[in-house]
Regions:
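An acidic, low-aromatic, low-complexity terminal/linker signal
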Residues: 1-181
């Protein structure tokens, strides 16, 4: 095949891709925390396990429930709702679970985070046009955006911030108690 023929073929395939305009679906989970519904890509999820009482951590804020052992690691477990709303934690039920999430930390200190769920998460495939921002400007620690997806209000968490908050709370660094201005 000549260089010109190869060039035309490449151009043609690029045009086809551009013309189709299809955006890829993102495989996500709708995650029912104790009071909120979260939307996260499945790639952030390591495993969902039955709820077990976390071992308390000294001087931890109320939203950091303690840590559980998972795959021979100590994983800090927190209540997302208590963190963002500044409230106490809610009661756990026999349906409660802990979702182990991959943290975004490059540190090996907290490679995973545990978040309390009221029930099992539900898979959902999402495209950009499926998500609508609600316009709720309420600022909360650990919240990237408040959205509506599949006729449900949900939160896209700020995983960087959550990792930072949990790491600091779990290992005694200076507490973070308010939003940056």
């Amino acid at each position: 095949m000549s260089r010109q023929a190869r060039g035309r073929k490449k151009k043609g395939s690029k045009k086809t891709l551009r013309r189709s305009g299809k955006q890829p679906e993102v495989h996500c989970m709708l995650i029912p925390t104790d009071q909120e519904l979260l939307l996260l890509p499945t790639s952030t999820m390591a495993e969902v396990v039955d709820y077990q009482n976390p071992e308390p951590m000294p001087d931890a804020p109320p939203w950091l429930l303690g840590q559980v052992e998972w795959n021979n690691r100590q994983v800090p477990v927190f209540s997302f709702s208590a963190l963002i709303n500044g409230t106490g934690t809610t009661e756990v039920s026999d349906k409660s679970k802990i979702m182990v999430l991959k943290s975004l930390s490059v540190s090996t200190r907290v490679p995973y985070l545990g978040i309390v769920l009221r029930d099992l998460p539900r898979p959902v495939n999402v495209m950009e046009e499926d998500i609508r921002e609600t316009g709720d400007e309420k600022k909360s620690l650990g919240v990237f955006s408040r959205i509506q997806v599949e006729d449900s209000d949900a939160i896209i968490p700020d995983m960087d911030r959550l990792t930072h908050l949990v790491t600091h709370a779990a290992f005694g660094a200076l507490p973070i108690t308010q939003l940056d201005s």
